[in-house]
């Protein structure tokens, strides 16, 4: 089942259920995609307007990036579910003999690495989403500036949520050096892009209250 083909109602129903997927990872990807779509909306409300003719080409370029990014995040909704399947299977492997224990450890290590790869990819996409939101807030239609702020906040939330999904998997890794490297990769993205998202929000909020 392709989770992205579900209606909003069905997706949320499955999210609330005991079903193994979607979970926090897929939900984060969807929230990130929604944030990027909001930014793209700002761009589409800006193009074709005489007032913004000077930035028309820049906005069109942003829109092209946003559309590609949204589709990437949509695909990551399903990718997260697909990554959970081998992880669940690995936990179910027998470990009664030394050979079984060794095999389970190897399979689990590979599955945990795969389960980290998707949220790290979501984080990377959300970082780009925050950059786009910053550009839309600066150059897009003032009538939709609140949506640019929302775009930044959605991508920020998805970024932080995905960092938690990295952490829950690295916590279980026996290769602590590898786990630390993945945690550091996530931490670098948080350190760089959370302040940018907050800056976009504060800028938009100040403009709306002026």
Regions from the language model: what does each represent?
Residues 3-21:
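Short, hydrophobic/aliphatic alpha-helical segments
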Residues 11, 34-41, 83, 122-132, ...:
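Amphipathic, well-ordered alpha-helical segments in soluble domains
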Residues 17-40, 144-162:
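Conserved phosphate/anionic-ligand binding catalytic regions in large, soluble enzymes, centered on
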Residues 30-34, 62, 69-76, 115-125, ...:
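Amphipathic alpha-helix face/heptad-repeat signature
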Residues 41-53:
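Transmembrane signal-anchor/signal-peptide helices with a preference for the extracytoplasmic
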Residues 50-89, 189, 196:
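A structural-propensity feature for long, helix-poor, extended segments
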Residues 80, 84-153, 157:
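Amphipathic alpha-helical interface segments
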Residues 129-132, 144-204, 210:
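Preference for long, well-ordered alpha-helical segments
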């Amino acid at each position: 089942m392709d989770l992205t083909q579900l209606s909003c109602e069905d997706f949320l129903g499955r999210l609330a259920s005991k079903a193994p997927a979607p979970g926090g990872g897929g939900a984060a990807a969807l929230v990130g995609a929604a944030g990027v779509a909001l930014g793209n909306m700002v761009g589409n409300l800006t193009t074709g307007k005489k007032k913004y003719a000077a930035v028309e080409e820049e906005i069109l370029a942003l829109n092209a990036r946003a559309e590609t990014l949204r589709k990437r995040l949509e695909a990551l909704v399903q990718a997260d579910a697909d990554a959970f399947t081998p992880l669940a299977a690995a936990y179910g492997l027998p470990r009664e003999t030394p050979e079984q224990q060794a095999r389970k450890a190897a399979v689990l290590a590979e599955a945990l690495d795969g389960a980290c790869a998707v949220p790290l990819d979501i984080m990377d996409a959300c970082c780009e989403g925050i950059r786009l939101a910053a550009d839309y807030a600066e150059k897009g239609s003032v009538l939709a500036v609140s949506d640019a702020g929302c775009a930044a906040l959605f991508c920020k939330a998805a970024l932080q949520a995905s960092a938690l999904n990295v952490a829950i998997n690295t916590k279980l890794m026996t290769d602590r050096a590898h786990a630390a490297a993945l945690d550091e990769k996530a931490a670098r993205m948080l350190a760089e892009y959370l302040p940018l998202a907050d800056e976009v929000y504060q800028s938009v909020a100040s403009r709306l209250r002026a």
